[in-house]
Amino acid sequence: MKLKLKKLFRIKQKDPHCSVVVVAAGSSERMGGDKMLMTLGAKPVIIRTLMAFQQCPMVDDIVVVTRREKIMAMADMIKLYDISKVSQVISGGATRAESSLAGVSAVRKGAKLIAIHDGARPLVSRELIERVVREANEHISAVPVIPSTDTLKKIDENGVITGSVDRASVVRVQTPQVFDADIIKGALTKAVEKHLPITDDCSAVDMMGFSTYTVEGDTGNIKLTLPEDMVLAEAILKSRGE
């Protein structure tokens, strides 16, 4: 009689691994300076972002996408802080899709999952990273979301309210967004070639007809856009004891 060992012993599944693209190629116009280099809790914003992925065991390598004129300064800073998982620092494109495509094209060969993250979200936690990676490993595409707590209205071209939006059907999407490597490469290639108006990376996947699953996001995982966001980020760090 043959016995199947899987029925006798619980086999521990290995955690999925991924490559990461950190997009830090924006102009930072609304911030009034290069937010990636601004100090947050005694460290540059971009370094805090990269350290979150450096310390996550599910992450194999990191590609940083920045502006061409910032490549050397970024590379020197990464070396100074010993962010060893960064394999490349490359220049981005004119649009988010172009920058993301450059990044996913530069990750290590053989990567099955690719996470794309805003460089301006330095407070991302290891727990959130792992939660999204696990979901994408199950469903090929996953993003973190948080509920909308504001009242949402529709307006016409004149700015007149025409109706309300059910908050139960609306969420705020964060990063990292994690995808099957082949699918995100194909989706971003199509978005760039056809000049599709995407505002985040899962939009490109959605336009190809693939479903994107969601996981619980983190209200502390804010995106630094305006000067007052830095004040909030410092407060969040303080509340975390950092």
Which residue stretches match the model-derived regions?
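Residue-level signal for inorganic ion chemistry
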Residues: 22, 46, 103, 117-118, ...
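Acidic helix N-cap motif at the loop->helix transition within catalytic regions
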Residues: 72-77
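Short, flexible, basic/aromatic active-site loop/helix in glycosyltransferases
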Residues: 153-179
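Conserved donor nucleotide-binding strand/loop of the catalytic core
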Residues: 81-94
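Conserved beta-loop-beta/alpha segment of the NTase-like Rossmann-fold superfamily
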Residues: 94-157, 174
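Short aromatic/basic micro-patch
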Residues: 39, 123, 164, 178, ...
